[in-house]
UniProtKB/Swiss-Prot annotation:
GO terms for molecular function: metal ion binding; phospho-N-acetylmuramoyl-pentapeptide-transferase activity; UDP-N-acetylmuramoyl-L-alanyl-D-glutamyl-meso-2,6-diaminopimelyl-D-alanyl-D-alanine:undecaprenyl-phosphate transferase activity. This is Phospho-N-acetylmuramoyl-pentapeptide-transferase. It holds the Pfam family MraY_sig1. Keywords: Cell cycle, Cell division, Cell membrane, Cell shape, Cell wall biogenesis/degradation, Magnesium, Membrane, Metal-binding, Peptidoglycan synthesis, Transferase, Transmembrane, Transmembrane helix. The chain crosses the membrane at residues 3-23, 55-75, 80-100, 117-137, 156-176, 187-207, 231-251, 255-275, 280-300, 334-354. It catalyses: UDP-N-acetyl-alpha-D-muramoyl-L-alanyl-gamma-D-glutamyl-meso-2,6-diaminopimeloyl-D-alanyl-D-alanine + di-trans,octa-cis-undecaprenyl phosphate = di-trans,octa-cis-undecaprenyl diphospho-N-acetyl-alpha-D-muramoyl-L-alanyl-D-glutamyl-meso-2,6-diaminopimeloyl-D-alanyl-D-alanine + UMP. Pathway: Cell wall biogenesis; peptidoglycan biosynthesis. GO terms for cellular component: plasma membrane. It is a multi-pass membrane protein. Its cofactor is Mg(2+).
């Protein structure tokens, strides 16, 4: 528990202190966000708000994770794990793609950064490397950071993917989650607040896996997860980093996370879901992100096939704005829905454990 508190605290402090420094730096150099011309009229006054605040989030997560391990050395703690480094490596690589996208938007003074091909290639490259490496690094118990079995709250042994299919599966998961969080990041604080809740749920889930790991506590309901405690630290550090950033990103936002932050945070969800064997459960926890990307897909499909739009504007948080909801109303209600989804996800996780042990 001490390690979790250290991870949250260090990440929060780094994020909340680094963000205003970035605001001053980006403002001085004119690194402001461009706004969609077809967006809600209320968003036009946000033009010029500093972007790329995701740098503070990624730095906070790394600081929380590494700081906890450095502090643990004084108490003979274990070093970083393969699972932890791979999840953070994935998030950082995606954050790098987002950083380039943000930088191009700023340099060209328009709301279009990397073209779709370049952005997709960057995401797929990160996903392929992650998918290949995450099945390596077998530990003494014979566990690798991920399993080729499809998973709900643990492996579904009847659905095992061949290595090539598993890599393809990772490509889909990584691309879907990174884009889903990216689409959600359209209102002040919406993505950061929602991510804090989802990763808080992952703190509970992965810590429970750690306390009931088959390696240390074999028996009914135990979990075959390679490095559950390290995943807990990453989730906790993400909670702290998002809260620290949210202090400055809450409406009216002083800075936006940009694609730097949203793609990286999507990578955190993708990485945690794969390494904790909860790929299907993650869809419940991140229901808001799933709904946002689904609204975009439906809008595109409907317009191309019928010439009509399903929503006034997609992602669908803008639909409610154009329907007359205040931005803060949309944000708070979507946060509430995220909290409910996370609560449901934790209940499903715990319920499966109770059913497994026959309680």
């Amino acid at each position: 528990m001490r390690q979790i508190l250290v991870a949250v605290t260090v990440a929060l402090v780094v994020s909340i202190l680094l963000t205003p420094a970035l605001i001053r730096l980006f403002t001085r150099h004119g690194f402001g966000q461009e706004i969609r011309e077809d967006g809600p009229p209320s968003h036009h006054n946000k033009r010029g708000t500093p972007s790329m605040g995701g740098v503070a989030i990624v730095a906070g997560i790394w600081a929380g994770y590494l700081g906890t391990h450095l502090a643990g050395l004084a108490f003979d703690g274990e070093g970083v794990s393969a699972s932890g480094v791979l999840v953070l490596g994935l998030a950082t690589a995606l954050g790098g793609v987002g950083f380039l996208d943000d930088l191009i938007k700023i340099r060209r003074s328009r709301n279009l950064g990397l073209n779709k091909t370049a952005k997709t290639v960057g995401q797929i490259t990160a996903a392929v490397l992650f998918g290949v490496l995450v099945l390596q690094f077998r530990n003494g118990a014979g566990l690798t950071p991920a399993s080729a079995d499809l998973s709900y709250v643990r492996e579904i042994a009847t659905v095992t993917l061949a290595p090539a299919l598993f890599v393809l599966f990772c490509m889909v998961i990584v691309s879907a989650w990174s884009n889903a969080v990216n689409f959600t990041d359209g209102l002040d604080g919406l993505a950061a607040g929602s991510m804090a809740m989802v990763t808080a749920a992952y703190v509970l889930i992965t810590f429970w896996q750690y306390r009931n790991a088959c390696v240390t506590a074999p028996g009914l309901g135990c979990y075959n997860v390679r490095d559950p405690l390290d995943l807990t630290l990453i989730a906790a550090a993400t909670v702290g980093a998002c809260i620290g950033f949210l202090w400055w990103n809450a409406a009216p936002a002083k800075i936006f996370m940009g694609d730097t932050g949203s793609l990286a945070l999507g990578g955190v969800i993708a990485g945690l879901s794969v390494t904790s064997r909860t790929e299907i459960l993650a869809v419940v926890l991140g229901s808001l992100f799933v709904a946002e990307i689904t609204s975009v897909v439906l809008q595109i499909l409907a317009f191309r096939t019928t010439g009509r739009r399903v929503f006034r504007m997609a992602p669908f948080h803008h639909h409610f704005e154009l329907a007359g909801w205040a931005e803060t109303t949309v944000i708070i209600r979507f946060w509430l829905l995220t909290a409910i989804a996370c609560g449901l996800g934790v209940v499903l996780f715990y319920g499966e454990w109770l059913a497994t042990i026959g309680a």
